[in-house]
UniProtKB/Swiss-Prot annotation:
The lineage of its organism: Eukaryota, Fungi, Dikarya, Ascomycota, Saccharomycotina. The chain crosses the membrane at residues 4-26. Keywords: Membrane, Transmembrane, Transmembrane helix. It is a single-pass membrane protein. This is Uncharacterized protein YLR342W-A. GO terms for cellular component: membrane. It comes from Saccharomyces cerevisiae (strain ATCC 204508 / S288c). It is found in: Membrane. It comes from the Eukaryota.
Length: 57
């Protein structure tokens, strides 16, 4: 389990940073979000959450 700890920390930080970026862009650049940035961020978050759940199981 100790081998997977840096990977888990990286995935958690990646999801947190992506959510912060999406909220920032949603607040200040709604046109940028409408052009597909929110879709990409949500997709990467889904992938990271799936990886975290699979690693925990």
């Amino acid at each position: 389990m100790n081998v997977f700890m840096p990977i888990r920390v990286f995935l958690y930080s990646y999801v947190i940073i992506n959510s912060l970026l999406s909220s920032f862009f949603h607040q200040y650049r709604p046109l940028f979000i409408k052009n597909g940035a929110a879709f990409g961020v949500s997709n990467s978050e889904k992938i990271c959450v799936t990886l975290i759940v699979n690693e925990l199981i």
